[in-house]
Amino acid sequence: MAEIHTPYSSLKKLLSLLNGFVAVSGIILVGLGIGGKCGGASLTNVLGLSSAYLLHVGNLCLVMGCITVLLGCAGWYGATKESRGTLLFCILSMVIVLIMEVTAATVVLLFFPIVGDVALEHTFVTLRKNYRGYNEPDDYSTQWNLVMEKLKCCGVNNYTDFSGSSFEMTTGHTYPRSCCKSIGSVSCDGRDVSPNVIHQKGCFHKLLKITKTQSFTLSGSSLGAAVIQRWGSRYVAQAGLELLA
């Protein structure tokens, strides 16, 4: 026998659909958090603590995303079982999650301008102190070699950053092999600094641009998820009250 469609049954289906939107926004946040953690980890190795906030925001998005997915599932259960307590719990919890998401996005947008000022000096000093060379196994040197090769740059400001550094004192070279345009060429000897041999520009501004992109992606996506959740939770509350009245 076909199911009789009544306003009551339609309201239950609407509640289930709205909670599905809430769960989808949570999945978006989980993906965003994973991406933020992966990208933030690499940047933190190079830029240091000045970019560590990306990791923290990524962790926060991951946690909030998992909570939102659970709330969406709980809301769906509350709608199908007509549980007033479950629906009220989900609605109140979503309000808290929304506040956290908006706060996280605001912190990222406000904090980013400070990163450039703090990161430049910190990254410069750390590079001169901790960078060891092209084939060195330590994580710091490995990450910097990868950055210089992929971004086609040399040092923080330029190749002169290695002058007087621990790297030069240890190897006697003016720049590492990863600064060369062609790593296997004979002219890449650590002394020839001509534009045909090594990259003349530093990596800092390129790294800062990547950090800016990731920061705005995190904040924008977090606000986007918050809009979806705000819309969903609003109608969940209205429909839930009508259903359980």
Swiss-Prot record:
SUPFAM superfamilies reported in the protein's UniProt record: Tetraspanin
Superkingdom, taxonomy of origin: Eukaryota
Extracellular face residues: 35-37, 81-94
Main location: membrane
Subcellular location: Membrane
Regions that span the bilayer: 14-34, 38-58, 60-80, 95-115
Membrane topology: Multi-pass membrane protein
Tissue expression notes: Broadly expressed in most human tissues and cell lines including neural and bone marrow derived tissues.
InterPro entries: Tetraspanin/Peripherin, Tetraspanin_animals, Tetraspanin_EC2_sf
Keyword Transmembrane: yes
Cytoplasmic side: 1-13, 59, 116-245
Keywords for the protein's UniProt record, in alphabetical order: Membrane, Transmembrane, Transmembrane helix
Similarity annotation: Belongs to the tetraspanin (TM4SF) family.
Protein name in UniProt: Tetraspanin-16
Gene name per UniProt: TSPAN16
